[in-house]
Amino acid sequence: YFSYNDKIIKILEAEYLNAAHHFTSGTLISDKLEIACGSGILRVKKLQQESKKALNIEEFLRGTNILKDTVLK
């Protein structure tokens, strides 16, 4: 899970990409919700914002504007 705009968002489905990067862990590195983590990248596929239904990434991004380079916590 991560927090964004004071809301908890659960990651329900994701893919780990074993790829080198220079970003701080937690940094959003693309507009498709790819998150830098440790020594790879987490590509989020499905998530659920608190008190809302589960959405695939395309549905979520239609209603939520998270900017690239945002550091998620």
Swiss-Prot record:
It catalyses: L-methionyl-tRNA(fMet) + (6R)-10-formyltetrahydrofolate = N-formyl-L-methionyl-tRNA(fMet) + (6S)-5,6,7,8-tetrahydrofolate + H(+). GO terms for molecular function: methionyl-tRNA formyltransferase activity. InterPro entries: Formyl_trans_C, Formyl_trans_C_sf, Formyl_transferase-like_C_sf, Met-tRNA-FMT_C. Its EC number is 2.1.2.9. It comes from the Bacteria. Keywords: Protein biosynthesis, Transferase. Attaches a formyl group to the free amino group of methionyl-tRNA(fMet). The formyl group appears to play a dual role in the initiator identity of N-formylmethionyl-tRNA by promoting its recognition by IF2 and preventing the misappropriation of this tRNA by the elongation apparatus. Belongs to the Fmt family. This is Methionyl-tRNA formyltransferase. The lineage of its organism: Bacteria, Pseudomonadati, Pseudomonadota, Alphaproteobacteria, Rickettsiales. The gene is fmt.
